[in-house]
Every structure is written in structure tokens, then in C-alpha cells.
Amino acid sequence: MGIEPNILENKKRHIEICLNKNDVKGGCNFLKFIKLKHNALSDFNFSEISLKEEIFGYNINMPVFISSMTGGGKQGNDFNKSLVKIANYLKIPIGLGSFKLLFKYPEYIRDFSLKRYAYDIPLFANIGAVQIVEFGISRIAEMIKRLEVDAIVTHLNAGQELMNVNGDRNFKGIKESIAKLADFLSVPLIVKETGFGISPNDVKELLKLGVSYIDLAGSGGTNWVLVEGIRSNNLNVASCFSDWGIPSIFTLLGIDDSLKANVFASGGYETGMDIAKGIALGAKLIGVAAVVLRAFYNSGEDAVLSLFSDYEHVLKMSMFLSGSKSLSELRKNKYFLSSYLLAELGVFKQFYET
């Protein structure tokens, strides 16, 4: 039995829509209002700079991961397989698209079982928080075991679901299910948003629930309400949420330093300088997605490799010019904020911090 054509068409349409950045970009991520401090007396060899990080028992080559995007159908599967091979070559982590459809079409499990291509890197499976409630802890855990992944990402995408006429509406029980799954699993659990961000208080609550890592996935990147609005020809509603959400840097600046080792940042990080700023603010890793998707579909695998080569070069230059030999040194107060961002941050803290 093949996957229902409408499911495959929706996935294909999502990719097509996301290829046009200007149509689906949500708000501002405020990265342009952060500057790294220049150090004119960096007294070491550029070759001494290390971008290496350790995560889930793997040594990775830079603090960047390819975030979960799509899965299912030939187009999505070919895309994932290519990216997993690229990620393994680069020695960076990668997440796969949601494996929700495997509960209806278990015969397609090999399309999601890509650890054979990711033997040197962490590979993340992905499922919606609502599906934990729907399918139950034991079935989710069994599927993760069969997929042989190093961690699972569970995504919070209420905005996208509410914009989708056939999307989920009942989110009751997701916090309890996340806590139970975190306790039950033998692999780390990562919770991520999908473009609207996670507040400092929600970060604290998720960590108390037993979550290993949190991907903020803040506003300023792909806005999935806009994606669904375009797909369903209902921008009258979707456009009302074009600037909804919390930029990841607001949360990074709003949480205690002690929590940042458990936090990833994503949401509109497109350049090596964006990545450098996110790391300087304390993020453990930076996630990239749409920028990789566009490079791949517009110009192929070589364009993705070129993108990451640029990331490496810019990140190393930023570290040298700020006097940082290592990522830990870059995280030591090597930035300053514009007056505009300070004002915006003050408003944010007034309403989001207790």
C-alpha cells in the first residue's frame, strides 16, 4: 500500500513554498543588532582555533546541526539521504523529518532508518508532541529503537497545526507525555519549537520535565503559519501571525548561564556570522534548515558543502577577530547589544520573566 497521494502532495508543496524565502520569513530574529567585540591584539596562530564540540558522545567538527525538515515520499527521502551523507562527511549532527507516517505505513521504515549513512555523527529522529499522546510512550519508544537513532526530537508546532484545516486541535496532555517519554527513553530527548520560539520560563519547565536539550527555534526564520496559509490559500488569516513569536536571542539573553549548555538556537540563522553570534550568546549548537534546503534544491550537494565551508571560514574569522581560540572562549562575554535591542529586551523581560 502506497502513501496517500494527498500526504505526499502536502509534503512536496511545503518544500516548494519554503524555497521562496521572502514569502515565509517570519519577523525579525534581531541578530543584526548584536555585535561581536573586536580584539586587535589576538596573539595566537589562526590555525590554533578549534570549532570542535562534543554532543551525545560524538566529537563534531563545528557547533552546527541540520535541523529536521521533511520525510516520506521519494523526494523527501532522497533529500534526507543526501543530507545525511553530507552531514556525516562534515561531521555535524542532523535531524530527520517526522516519522509519524510510519505508524500508518510501517513498511517505509527503511526510508527513515538512515543511521547506516550517519555512522560518525549524531542522528535525530523527530515526532510531534501531540503524537506522543496519540500513539503512546511504548509505541514511540519502540519506533525509536527500530530507527537506531542517537536522540529524538519532539516538536511543538501548534501554530502550524491550527492553521492547517486538517491539523491537530487537542494538545491536552503534552507536558505529561513529554515528561514520561523523557523518563522512559534510553536516548536523549530534545524538545523544539518550529519557528515561534520558547520563553525562558518554558525552558526552565521543560528541563524540569526531564528534557535533555531544548531547541529554541525562534521567530525570524521560516514561519509555518505562513507556509500553511500559502498552501491553503488563506493568507488573510496567516498574515496576522507574520511577526508572531519569540526570537531565540531573547531567550538566550533571558536565561541563566547555567542552563545554556542544554540549549540549541535556531530560527533564521543563515550565515557564519549569525552562527558566531548565537554561540557567543551561549548556545550549545546552532540549527540551520531552510538555508540548506534552498541551497540543495537550487544548486545541489556542492552548494550545501560550499555553504558549510563558508560557515567554517566566517566562524573562525569571527573567533580570531574577537580573540577566541575555542568556542568556550567565544561564549565569554564577547558581544555587545545595540540600544534598540536593549530596549526591546527590556520589554521582553518585563512580560516573559517572573
Swiss-Prot record:
Binding site residues for substrate: 11-12, 98-100, 160
Subunit relationships: Homooctamer. Dimer of tetramers.
Protein name stated in the entry: Isopentenyl-diphosphate delta-isomerase
Function: Involved in the biosynthesis of isoprenoids. Catalyzes the 1,3-allylic rearrangement of the homoallylic substrate isopentenyl (IPP) to its allylic isomer, dimethylallyl diphosphate (DMAPP).
Cofactor needs: FMN; NADPH; Mg(2+)
Protein residues bound to FMN: 67-70, 98, 126, 192, 222, 289-290
Enzyme class: isomerase
Entry binding sites for Mg(2+): 161
Subcellular location: Cytoplasm
GO molecular function: FMN binding; isopentenyl-diphosphate delta-isomerase activity; magnesium ion binding; NADPH binding; oxidoreductase activity
EC number: 5.3.3.2
The organism of origin for this protein: Borrelia garinii subsp. bavariensis (strain ATCC BAA-2496 / DSM 23469 / PBi) (Borreliella bavariensis)
Gene (name only): fni
GO CC field: cytoplasm
InterPro entries: Aldolase_TIM, FMN-dep_DH, IPdP_isomerase
Phylogenetic lineage: Bacteria, Pseudomonadati, Spirochaetota, Spirochaetia, Spirochaetales
Organism superkingdom: Bacteria
This protein's record includes keyword Magnesium: yes
GO biological process: isoprenoid biosynthetic process
Reactions catalysed, as given in the entry: isopentenyl diphosphate = dimethylallyl diphosphate
Any one Pfam family match given in the protein's UniProt record, by short name: FMN_dh
